[in-house]
Amino acid sequence: MKLVIVSGRSGSGKSVALRVLEDLGYYCVDNLPLPLIGSLLEQLKGSNDLVAISVDVRNMPEQDKVLVQQLSNLPAGTEITSFFLNSSDKVLLKRYSETRRLHPLSKSRVSLQEAIKLEGKLLEPMSKLVDHYIDTSNLNIYDLSDQVRQILLGSVDKELVIYFESFGFKNGMPTEADFMFDVRFLPNPHWELALRPLTGLDEPVAEFLNRQPLVNKFIWQIENLLETWLPHLERNNRSYLTIAIGCTGGQHRSVYVAEQLAKRFSNGKHKVNVRHRELDNAKA
């Protein structure tokens, strides 16, 4: 079992790091007291091999030797990777002033500046024990995400899951779509009596549409558009992308186009899924 522990000063980006870990398939728990880590790992044994927790100053032991002892009591075979995120007092003060969030150590008689300094002092033992120390003072959330992925995977690349979904406009547009393409202007197999009862998954319909230059040109243009912008979407920390293709009934043209696009992007670079809303609903 792999365990990633994310600690650091409040406002330095722990929640960002935890979201990256969640995208990588880790079971994530925020602000878990260290004495409970062993119980958590026992509960998840056999169901989750990747676990990540974040701890803040309120859950940290005062003595570093207590911390070492707590970690040594974890189940045998636990592979631990630890991060400590930090930023300068000036940057943390600016971030808290902008978000107006309450600092974990803020009290009625303690100013924000004093709370930030106190937290840094309390977390100093932990900062000396971790595997990876990251100063986020000059990092944005994308830079930090890339660093965490680089450390864990050896690469900043993340797997973007692409969903191609066909649908019929007569039944409403899918609300989850990031891109939507209307193919109702393409030649319609519905008007071919022999093809009317079939779907875009059937070979006769596929052959009919493949013979249409307009269909092939439109598919090529969508492919080119997506190929151009996918790298930028990936760098923007997108985990998935839904591309909806709509025709009148969601039976012929949209199904065929969605299938063709899914095949073209199933090249190993991305995880691709295709679903046909109207066909699936008809089976239900």
Curated annotation (Swiss-Prot):
GTP binds at residues 56-59. It comes from the Bacteria. SUPFAM superfamilies: P-loop containing nucleoside triphosphate hydrolases. Belongs to the RapZ-like family. InterPro entries: P-loop_NTPase, RapZ-like, RapZ-like_N, RapZ_C. ATP binds at residues 8-15. The lineage of its organism: Bacteria, Pseudomonadati, Pseudomonadota, Gammaproteobacteria, Alteromonadales. This is Nucleotide-binding protein Sputcn32_0712. Keywords: ATP-binding, GTP-binding, Nucleotide-binding. Coiled coil: none annotated. It holds the Pfam family PapZ_C. GO terms for molecular function: ATP binding; GTP binding. Displays ATPase and GTPase activities.
